[in-house]
A protein has these predicted regions:
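Membrane-helix/interface signature in polytopic inner-membrane proteins
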Residues: 140-173
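Hydrophobic alpha-helical transmembrane segments
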Residues: 10-15, 58-63, 88-89, 128-133, ...
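Generic alpha-helical transmembrane segments of integral inner-membrane proteins
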Residues: 14, 18-22, 63-71, 97, ...
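Hydrophobic alpha-helical segments embedded in the membrane of multi-pass proteins
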Residues: 18, 40-42, 168-179, 191-201
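Transmembrane helix-bundle core of multi-pass membrane transporters
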Residues: 7-8, 79, 87-147
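Membrane-interfacial amphipathic/re-entrant helices at transmembrane-helix boundaries
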Residues: 1-18
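Short loop segments and helix-boundary regions at transmembrane helix junctions
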Residues: 25-108
């Protein structure tokens, strides 16, 4: 009745939505939508490095996005710049570097529209495997840090006083966001990932 590519697209979309829903709750509660945009923009650099080094795209995006997230956390502690200024600086810097690298990789053909908006109909069996292994793993880790993350969302000082280590929970949460971006970038695209984090929540 349905073609294989339609079934794969449906299964992939459901897998991503199941993960982005719980993550998106904290994105909304902690007002991190622009933070998600920053990680999504940095993913372009991860994609270009994956193509240039013939590396796995999802793993490359995860590494680059995680590094950007952890750098951002450290910069927020060590600088007087407003948070939104740091987000804009990192988002557009990583996006610009990614576009420059694409310009130099003339021997590789890039599907820019696919990178920006995704192509869910091009989902392969390997993509489904990554989504349905990576997704539950992200949810499992989120469950483990749910209490300190939720407590610090309500009241950071109280969570710290109770010894819940909110800074560690925040760092782990940013890495989880990098993870969902990595496994969904092919299907959703750079520009729509933040929407997938917010809308299901």
């Amino acid at each position: 009745m349905f073609d294989d590519f339609f079934i794969r697209a449906l299964v992939a979309g459901l897998g991503i939505a199941f993960v982005t829903g719980p993550l998106g709750c904290f994105v909304i509660w902690r007002r991190l939508s622009y933070f998600g945009d920053t990680l999504a923009h940095s993913a372009l650099l991860g994609v270009t490095l994956a193509y240039s080094l013939e590396f796995n795209i999802a793993l490359s995006v995860f590494i680059i996005s995680s590094l950007i997230a952890l750098i951002l956390i450290q910069l927020q502690k060590r600088t007087n710049l407003p948070g939104d200024a740091l987000l804009g600086l990192l988002a557009h810097s990583s996006l610009a570097v990614g576009l420059v690298v694409i310009g130099f990789l003339t021997f590789i053909r890039f599907d820019i529209m696919g990178l920006l908006f995704g192509d869910i109909l091009a989902v392969t069996a390997d993509d489904l495997l990554i989504i349905w292994i990576g997704g539950p793993l992200i949810l499992l880790i989120l469950k483990l840090i749910w209490k300190p993350l939720f407590a610090s969302t309500v009241n950071y000082e109280l969570a710290e006083a109770e010894g819940l280590n909110p800074d560690r929970a925040k760092a782990v949460f940013t890495v989880l966001m990098a993870g969902i971006i990595a496994i969904s970038i092919k299907m959703v695209g750079l520009l729509l990932i933040t929407g997938m984090l917010i809308i299901p929540a």
